[in-house]
């Protein structure tokens, strides 16, 4: 039995009209939240289609404490700690382990790791492996990963092993929206 609190009418927790054009995704998410069951989602789509916004709203409506890993900031912090003295390296590893073992985790903007090097890709591959192992051992977890990459790009950037792990536990949701910023774009010509 899941320890997660069941949410009555989770749809009311989302902003009015939000993601109504993605009813399959939203209905699936709402079912999982209502039941209190663990969930793992991989949201893919172009920049600005609402992946991060939906992820944060999903987690907020659970009422649980959660960790958000912004890929770019997390990797820079990790690099800075690893390039400092010995004790900071152990702090970095300990912090990383704590975050990967949280009950609710959002990894935002996977594939936006800068610098985009083999070392960065290896690092994030290992993070996905750590989370995969934790999910396998502790069924009562929730994870959301957002990315602008599609499945083929994830395989090319990280590995087929990472994609295989994601496919085992994650519901993959493809957002077909265009950027909301483009919808609001006004170009004035002189």
Identify the function of each model-found stretch:
Residues 1-33, 169-173, 177, 181-190:
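A short, basic N-terminal segment
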Residues 38-42, 104, 142-144:
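Residue-level preference for the first positions of well-ordered beta-strands
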Residues 53-64:
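P-loop NTPase Walker A phosphate-binding motif
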Residues 101-103, 169-170:
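Short, well-ordered alpha-helix to beta-strand connector turns
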Residues 38-55:
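Walker A/P-loop nucleotide-binding motif
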Residues 63-101:
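Short glycine-rich substrate-engagement loop in P-loop NTPases that contacts/grips substrate
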């Amino acid at each position: 039995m899941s320890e997660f609190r069941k949410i009555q009418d989770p749809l009311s927790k989302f902003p009015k009209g939000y993601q109504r054009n993605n009813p399959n995704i939203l209905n699936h998410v709402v079912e999982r939240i209502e039941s209190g069951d663990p969930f793992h989602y991989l949201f893919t789509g172009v920049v600005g289609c609402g992946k991060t916004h939906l992820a944060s709203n999903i987690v907020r409506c659970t009422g649980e404490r959660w960790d958000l890993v912004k890929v770019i900031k997390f990797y820079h912090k990790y690099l800075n700690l690893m390039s400092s003295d010995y004790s900071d390296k152990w702090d970095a590893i300990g912090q990383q382990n704590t975050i990967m073992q949280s009950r609710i985790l959002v990894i935002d903007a996977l594939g936006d790791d800068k610098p985009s090097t083999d070392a960065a890709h290896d690092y994030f591959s290992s993070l996905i492996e750590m989370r995969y192992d934790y999910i396998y051992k502790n069924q009562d977890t929730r994870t959301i990963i957002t990315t602008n990459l599609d499945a083929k790009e994830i395989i090319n950037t990280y590995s087929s092993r990472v994609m295989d792990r994601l496919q085992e536990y994650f519901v993959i949701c493809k957002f077909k929206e265009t950027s909301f910023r483009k919808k609001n774009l006004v170009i004035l010509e002189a």
